């Protein structure tokens, strides 16, 4: 059954890559060489995702590992949004809302697609920077002499993408809440203990000004449970 699901996943992925690549090829008002360069670079980015997973990144210099991680993982999301965008454009062409010329060797179409994709990812990045604070009031059946203040975090996914500079800001936000206790509900690690060690993430955790209680998440098991426990 697992093999069947793997085959279905790979066929779906290949179909999506083929659909997006074909549309990009048709859309670009470039020479054949130019089309090959652009579509080839896109496909190599997808391949990078799989080579990162198969061969790993921990044996590479940190800057190289970060670059390969960002390239491979970003390509999935860019490809997914391109897939949805081209599906909408194809639907618009079928109902005669979008002229066929918009999708074939078109500077107008190319600039429009680039503008839409840039706008989507800029908005997404700005939303990512805005960390949402959700206040929760928990009632106790037992009498408490005073109120207690806790902060809970989840899915930090620290590593090659969420790096030390970013985590430093999160620590500052947590300390600003002045909690008595900090809870972390798993997935501190994204997938590599080495990425945390090289960036001395432990030093940032030590800046937290309250006791920390954390549990393992699935990414801790993926990165290696014994190593994750030692880091904890």
Predicted regions and their residues:
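Soluble catalytic domains of enzymes that build or remodel membrane lipids, polysaccharides, and related
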Residues: 134, 139-232
């Amino acid at each position: 059954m697992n093999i069947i699901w793997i085959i279905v996943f790979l066929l779906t992925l290949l179909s999506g890559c083929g659909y997006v690549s074909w549309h990009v090829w048709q859309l670009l008002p470039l020479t054949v060489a130019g089309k090959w360069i652009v579509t080839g670079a896109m496909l190599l980015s997808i391949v990078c995702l799989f080579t990162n997973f198969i061969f790993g990144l921990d044996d590479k210099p940190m800057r190289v590992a970060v670059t390969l991680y960002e390239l491979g993982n970003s390509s999935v999301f860019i490809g997914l949004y391109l897939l949805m965008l081209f599906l909408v454009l194809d639907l618009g062409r079928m109902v005669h809302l979008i002229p066929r010329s918009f999708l074939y060797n078109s500077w107008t179409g190319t600039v429009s697609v680039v503008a839409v994709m840039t706008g989507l990812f800029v908005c997404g990045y700005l939303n990512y920077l805005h960390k949402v604070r959700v206040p929760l009031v928990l009632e106790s059946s037992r009498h408490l002499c005073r109120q207690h203040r806790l902060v809970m975090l989840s899915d930090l996914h620290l590593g090659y993408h969420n790096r030390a500079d970013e985590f430093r800001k999160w620590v500052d936000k947590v300390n600003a809440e002045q909690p008595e206790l900090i809870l972390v509900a798993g997935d501190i690690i994204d997938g590599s203990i080495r990425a945390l060690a090289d960036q001395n993430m432990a030093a940032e955790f030590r800046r937290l000004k309250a006791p920390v209680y954390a549990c393992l998440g699935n990414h801790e098991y993926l990165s290696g449970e014994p190593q994750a426990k030692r880091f904890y």
